[in-house]
């Protein structure tokens, strides 16, 4: 019985210690934690500045104290964004970045962000798979090839060859959506060059000079 209890306790201890290690192995999580710590340092500095100003006789309504408060608040917004982003894995980011590239890579930041947000809306909707990979590989929706490492590598190889930054630009749009920076109703679940679902939330026209299209973002 004693051996059984010891073994059980060891298993529990391993489980507790392995969770942070699993997260730490994910570079996105590690980067987000570092960014959060940086923002908290900024908050500490802003707080200390405000306190120092108050001791010197400045009121809370003074421009200097207000500037310190603004800095603290902006850091808090950034922390909230990084906390949301930290919930996604490297694989989630890679798959969605590849998807955004193929769906709207050479359009505008707005369109790229909207495409990413539609996918994230689907992840949160019970009618669709609850993972980024599941949404992208769902039959009849996007494309299973978007979920492959090879597809992402091909984009980056082209960037390296041509001196372009298409993958990075698409990744920025994906992270903006994951951080909650894209304004779109949660029930916008469709994106295509035609209207569908329960009506159009917004249509966006794009003309590159050699290619023109209208994208419809629709309620589901």
Indicate where each model-derived feature is located.
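Positively charged n-region of N-terminal signal peptides that target proteins for export
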Residues: 1-4
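Bacterial N-terminal signal peptides
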Residues: 8-17
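Sec-dependent signal peptide cleavage junction
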Residues: 16-33
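Non-transmembrane amphipathic alpha-helical segments
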Residues: 32, 39-53, 75
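Short, charged, amphipathic alpha-helical segments
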Residues: 33, 59-72
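Charged, low-complexity interaction regions
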Residues: 47-65
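Signal peptide-directed extracytoplasmic domains
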Residues: 73-84
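Bacterial extracytoplasmic/cell-wall-associated proteins, especially those involved in peptidoglycan
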Residues: 84-220
């Amino acid at each position: 019985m004693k051996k059984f209890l010891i073994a059980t306790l060891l298993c529990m201890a391993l489980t507790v210690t392995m969770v942070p290690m699993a997260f730490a192995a994910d570079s996105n999580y590690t980067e987000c934690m570092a960014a959060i710590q940086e923002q908290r340092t900024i908050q500490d500095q802003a707080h200390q500045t405000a306190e120092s100003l108050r001791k010197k006789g400045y009121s809370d309504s003074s421009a200097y104290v207000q500037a310190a408060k603004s800095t603290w608040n902006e850091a808090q917004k950034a922390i909230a964004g990084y906390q949301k982003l930290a919930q996604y894995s490297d694989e989630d980011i890679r798959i969605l970045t590849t998807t955004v590239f193929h769906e709207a890579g050479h359009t505008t930041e707005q369109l790229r962000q909207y495409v990413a947000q539609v996918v994230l809306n689907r992840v949160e909707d019970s009618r669709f798979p609850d993972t980024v990979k599941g949404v992208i590989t769902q039959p009849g929706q996007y494309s299973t090839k978007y979920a492959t490492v090879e597809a992402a590598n091909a984009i980056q190889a082209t960037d390296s060859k041509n001196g372009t930054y298409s993958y990075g630009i698409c990744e920025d749009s994906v992270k903006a959506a994951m951080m909650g920076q894209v304004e779109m109703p949660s029930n916008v679940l469709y994106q295509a060059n035609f209207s569908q679902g329960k009506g159009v939330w917004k249509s966006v026209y794009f003309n590159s000079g050699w290619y023109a299209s209208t994208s419809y973002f629709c309620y589901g």
